[in-house]
From Swiss-Prot:
Keyword check for Ribosomal protein: yes
Stated family: Belongs to the bacterial ribosomal protein bL36 family.
Protein name, UniProt field: Large ribosomal subunit protein bL36c
Gene it is expressed from: rpl36
A single BP term in Gene Ontology: translation
Length: 37
């Protein structure tokens, strides 16, 4: 899980979602997991 100031999609499988007021990226590739914070 990468914690970044700005999250972006890395590939076409990445999905931007909001959980508990946090913007997160979920993907089938675990390296692409990110959250904003």
């Amino acid at each position: 899980m990468k914690v970044q100031a700005s999250v972006r999609k890395i590939c076409e499988n990445c999905r931007l979602i909001r959980r508990r007021r946090r913007v997160m990226v979920v993907c089938k590739n675990p390296k692409h997991k990110q959250r904003q914070g």
